[in-house]
Amino acid sequence: MRLCDRDIEAWLDSGKLGIDPRPPVERINGATVDVRLGNKFRVFLGHTAGFIDLSGPKDEVSAALERVMSDEIILPEGEAFFLHPGELALAVTLESVTIPDDLVGWLDGRSSLARLGLMVHVTAHRIDPGWQGRIVLEFYNSGKLPLALRPGMLIGALSFEPLSGPAARPYNSRQDAKYRGQQGAVASRIDKD
């Protein structure tokens, strides 16, 4: 059962759930909290690799990832990031989120953006118990026109679901937590699997 708006506010008030900066009550709706787009992005570079063998040797996968991902792009205030049709890019939420060990979070895109062809998360929309950091967005433009994305715009909504008990292995306590504490648009670390 997902938390309703009153329960989300109570979890925030108690400090068990953290969203920084804390959203105003107007962005806590029914069963979700609206989140905004941050100013950090990463894109795939031109065809610098014919393919990435995801099950290949870790050093080869790592080298291929280095060749295909840009450095982090930090947009100055007031500028837009343009996502062209058929392009995939990474970005982050403006808000940093701290989820306790007995709660799981879910990120959904906004219907208004989906109707323009913008996918906010390609497949990874679960936010694990014990998560701390910004949420990386996997943008894909499936529409026909370029989309101008500006930091600070509403980009998605978070919902939260209590677990039957605290997780035995919450994300931030795991040694294999590849994205622990991320604050930027961290590229895939599949080579760390």
Swiss-Prot record:
Its EC number is 3.5.4.13. It is an enzyme of class 3 (hydrolase). GO terms for molecular function: dCTP deaminase activity; nucleotide binding. The gene is dcd. Catalyzes the deamination of dCTP to dUTP. Gene3D superfamilies: 2.70.40.10. This is dCTP deaminase. The active site is at E138 (proton donor/acceptor). It catalyses: dCTP + H2O + H(+) = dUTP + NH4(+). Belongs to the dCTP deaminase family. GO terms for biological process: dUMP biosynthetic process; dUTP biosynthetic process; nucleobase-containing small molecule interconversion. Homotrimer. DCTP binds at R110, S111, S112, L113, A114, R115, D128, V136, L137, E138, Y171, K178, Q182. Pathway: Pyrimidine metabolism; dUMP biosynthesis; dUMP from dCTP (dUTP route): step 1/2. It comes from Yersinia enterocolitica serotype O:8 / biotype 1B (strain NCTC 13174 / 8081).
